[in-house]
């Protein structure tokens, strides 16, 4: 089973730039269940809003943005 190559260092660097996490399956390996689990975990959070391309002009094709409205942090999942 493939495991995540996302290190604690890379996560903390992302947090310093104002992001909670940046999960990039194209550049680092994460299992399908890890990515799906993170998305489901955030979707069931009451403050979560899922933005797709039709909701905002800032989303590019193929990007899904999960925004936590009560924080200034965004989590981006690239598929």
Curated annotation (Swiss-Prot):
GO biological process: apoptotic signaling pathway; cellular response to UV-C
GO molecular function, one term: cysteine-type endopeptidase activator activity
Natural source organism: Homo sapiens (Human)
Protein name: Suppressor of tumorigenicity 20 protein
Tissues with expression: Expressed in leukocytes, lung, spleen, liver, heart, kidney, muscle and uterine cervix. Down-regulated in cervical cancer.
Function noted in UniProt: May act as a tumor suppressor. Promotes apoptosis of cancer cells.
Keywords annotated in UniProt: Tumor suppressor
Cysteine pairings via disulfide bonds: none
């Amino acid at each position: 089973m493939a495991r995540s190559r996302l290190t604690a260092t890379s996560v903390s660097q992302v947090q310093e730039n104002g992001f909670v996490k940046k999960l990039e399956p194209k550049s680092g390996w994460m299992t399908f269940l890890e990515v799906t689990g993170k998305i489901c975990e955030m979707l069931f959070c009451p403050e979560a809003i899922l933005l797709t391309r039709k909701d905002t002009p800032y989303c590019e094709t193929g990007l899904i943005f999960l925004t936590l409205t009560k924080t200034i942090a965004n989590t981006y999942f690239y598929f």
